[in-house]
Structures are given as structure tokens and as C-alpha cells.
Regions:
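Surface-exposed cleft-lining segments at the edges of enzyme active sites
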Residues: 1-4, 79-80
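Short, flexible loop segments at the rims of nucleotide/cofactor-binding pockets, characterized by
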Residues: 3-4, 32-34
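Histidine-acidic metal/acid-base catalytic patches
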Residues: 9-28, 34-144
Length: 144
């Protein structure tokens, strides 16, 4: 979490590795990835075994982040549906696929006051359609 003591994959992997437990694993999320200023590039994952990444959450982000002092507020109130922000989600999912990660779960984590304010039905449909579009582009096999 970019606003925490474990701000990026490098530190997260160091914690998991130091734990030396079979069930210690990582979850990846494009909001956290982008806000940690990590490039969407396999080089970031090169030292991490694919089986140590258990799950991914997908969403998208605004181009301009909240101020560092309130970045957590963006995380808790202003995430975007996959493919509707800076457009990082499809490339993020492609990177996961290319690494050979086989997530036990692919979750959608769109935490957005603005989207929810349009009603639960709108939020569900908007998030579903956005997610489906990204997965059809980046990793259609997971939809089968």
C-alpha cells in the first residue's frame, strides 16, 4: 500500500520472503501498483515466483493522485472501474498473465463514492461491463 510501511512489491516480497511460510503470499492491485509509482513491467516481478501471488484485484485510477497526505482517502473513496481511468488495467492484467500467475481469485475492487451515488444497479452494471471489457481484451481465457 503506497501510503503504508509496505509501499510497493519489492517491500511486500521482502516481507513474504522473510516470513518463510508456505501460505505467505501477495495480492496485486493496479490502484496500489500505479500509486506506488511502479511501471507496469515484468521486471518489477522478476524475483517473485508466480505461485507466490495468490490473487489480483482490478480497478483503475485517475491520472492525477490525491496529495500524499490523503492518498488513503483516494483508495477508500475514489477508485475507478477497470479501464475507465488512465487505462492501466488491461496492461496490468496482461503483465499478470505473462508472468504465469494463476490467481486463485480475480476480484474487482472499485471503491467509489461517485459511482455508488448513481445507485447500486448502476454501480453493479458499470463495474461488471467495464471489468468484462478489460478481461476480454487482456485475458479472455479467464472468462471461460
Amino acid at each position: 500500500m503506497p501510503y503504508s510501511g509496505i509501499p510497493d512489491m519489492k517491500k511486500g516480497w521482502a516481507v513474504v520472503k522473510a516470513a518463510d511460510c508456505e501460505n505467505a503470499k501477495l495480492i496485486m492491485d493496479p490502484w496500489h501498483w500505479v500509486r506506488a509509482n511502479q511501471p507496469i513491467d515484468l521486471s518489477v516481478l522478476e524475483d517473485i515466483p508466480a505461485d507466490k501471488i495468490v490473487s489480483i484485484q482490478i480497478n483503475d485510477v485517475w491520472e492525477r493522485p490525491y496529495a500524499t497526505t490523503i492518498l488513503r482517502d483516494e483508495s477508500m473513496h475514489d477508485r475507478l472501474a477497470p479501464g475507465t481511468g488512465i487505462g492501466c488495467t488491461a496492461d496490468f492484467v496482461k503483465m499478470v498473465k505473462e508472468k504465469g500467475i494463476k490467481p486463485n481469485a480475480i476480484g474487482v475492487e472499485v471503491i467509489s463514492d461517485a459511482i455508488l451515488a448513481k445507485g447500486l444497479e448502476y454501480a453493479a452494471n458499470h463495474t461488471y461491463e467495464s471489468t468484462k471489457k478489460v478481461l476480454e481484451e487482456a485475458w479472455p481465457e479467464v472468462l471461460r
